[in-house]
């Protein structure tokens, strides 16, 4: 009998990288369906643009690096990055913004560092932040919910707005938004920030009706369900999502208790913006998050605290992307001080 000699590691995980990526993308479906239902088919168009750009950009870089195309493109990591960007960017934003964000995420934030497993920062969030800093007006121009528009945006209208900037009837996104009053056209976090600047607090919380915020609430519920599925399937651990949400809620609760005029209530933080998407799908990236159990708890808590701080006092209404990237910077330090001590060593 022949015995094969192999080196460590000897542990075995039945799930391949491709299988993990597919499960994460499937878990995003409830949130994607909610966003599409409330904000229109523009998200699907942006998703197609992002996927094509990600595959082309990754293929070009892999060819230049003389890496195998089939196995690298087939692992699903590029498509997951594209999906996260499509879920994060405004659904009716210009097509070139999605192309720029996706190409930057794949080429600069991922492949420049050596590809999957070597990037220190979450590629999707790097692409998002590049656009947010470079084009803040376009990045904060989310369309209102379909139910609030006098002229609901069809698939044809969405394609025209994304590729030409106007609908077949000659309406721009700004004109479509103008048909909705100033409260309902903003996201919940946008509305809160605007109210702080204009002195319209604290009555904002009572005037914000369910109809205006239903899309964001259901989207977050969808991502929460998808995240619980990933925990059940043991694709991700519970440490980062739970510590992130707990730290954010503790900060928001204390802030709202001490200064309700300048701090949003905890439930607004929990079910607005990219809270659940960030907690279960972005912060849990195994490449850029902490490696140890204690480290994951610290990493998640740090991210959640930063989300609350940026949302409350920062210049942008949602701080998930910046919080994740800032926490990514701290990962080497967290891993250094949370590594388990080897037996026999002090």
From Swiss-Prot:
Keywords for the protein's UniProt record, in alphabetical order: Cell inner membrane, Cell membrane, Electron transport, Flavoprotein, FMN, Membrane, Phosphoprotein, Translocase, Transmembrane, Transmembrane helix, Transport
Functional note: Part of a membrane-bound complex that couples electron transfer with translocation of ions across the membrane.
Residues modified to FMN phosphoryl threonine: 187
Protein name: Ion-translocating oxidoreductase complex subunit D
InterPro entries according to UniProt: NqrB/RnfD (IPR004338), RnfD_bac (IPR011303)
Membrane topology classification: Multi-pass membrane protein
UniProt keyword Flavoprotein present: yes
Annotated family: Belongs to the NqrB/RnfD family.
One GO CC term on file: plasma membrane
Subunit structure: The complex is composed of six subunits: RnfA, RnfB, RnfC, RnfD, RnfE and RnfG.
Domain of life: Bacteria
Keyword Cell membrane: yes
Assigned EC number: 7.-.-.-
Biological source species: Sodalis glossinidius (strain morsitans)
Compartments in which it is found: Cell inner membrane
Segments crossing the lipid bilayer: 20-40, 42-62, 69-91, 120-140, 212-232, 242-262, 264-284, 290-310, 314-334
Cofactor requirements of the protein: FMN
EC class: translocase
Chain's gene name: rnfD
UniProt-listed PANTHER family: ELECTRON TRANSPORT COMPLEX PROTEIN RNFD, ION-TRANSLOCATING OXIDOREDUCTASE COMPLEX SUBUNIT D
Gene Ontology biological process terms, A to Z: electron transport chain; transmembrane transport
């Amino acid at each position: 009998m022949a015995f094969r000699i192999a080196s460590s590691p000897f542990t075995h995980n039945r799930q391949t990288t491709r299988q993990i990526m597919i499960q994460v993308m499937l878990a995003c479906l409830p949130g994607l369906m909610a966003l599409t239902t409330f904000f229109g088919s523009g998200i699907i168009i942006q998703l197609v643009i992002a996927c094509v750009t990600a595959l082309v950009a990754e293929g070009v870089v892999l060819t230049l690096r003389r890496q195998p195309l089939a196995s690298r493109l087939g692992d699903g990591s590029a498509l997951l990055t594209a999906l996260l960007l499509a879920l994060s960017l405004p659904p009716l934003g210009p097509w070139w913004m999605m192309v720029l964000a996706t190409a930057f995420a794949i080429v600069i934030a991922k492949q420049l560092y050596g590809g999957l497993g070597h990037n220190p920062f979450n590629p999707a969030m790097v692409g998002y932040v590049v656009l947010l800093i470079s084009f803040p007006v376009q990045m904060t121009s989310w369309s209102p919910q379909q139910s609030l528009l006098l002229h609901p945006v069809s698939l044809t209208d969405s394609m025209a707005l994304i590729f030409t900037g106007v609908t077949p009837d000659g309406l721009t996104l700004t004109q479509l938004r103008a048909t909705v009053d100033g409260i309902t056209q903003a996201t919940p976090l946008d509305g809160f920030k605007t109210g702080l600047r204009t002195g319209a607090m604290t009555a904002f919380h009572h005037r914000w009706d369910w109809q205006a915020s239903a899309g964001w609430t259901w989207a977050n519920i969808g991502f929460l369900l998808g995240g619980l599925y990933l925990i059940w399937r043991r694709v991700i651990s519970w440490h980062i999502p739970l510590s992130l949400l707990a730290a954010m809620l503790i900060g928001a609760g204390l802030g709202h208790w001490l200064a309700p005029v300048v701090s949003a209530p905890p439930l607004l933080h929990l079910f607005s913006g990219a809270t659940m998407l960030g907690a279960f799908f972005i912060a849990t990236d195994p490449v850029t998050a902490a490696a140890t159990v204690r480290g994951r708890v610290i990493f998640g808590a740090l991210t959640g605290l930063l989300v609350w701080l940026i949302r409350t006092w920062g210049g942008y209404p949602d701080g998930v992307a910046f919080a994740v990237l800032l926490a990514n910077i701290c990962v080497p330090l967290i891993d250094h001080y949370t590594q388990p001590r080897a037996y026999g060593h002090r």
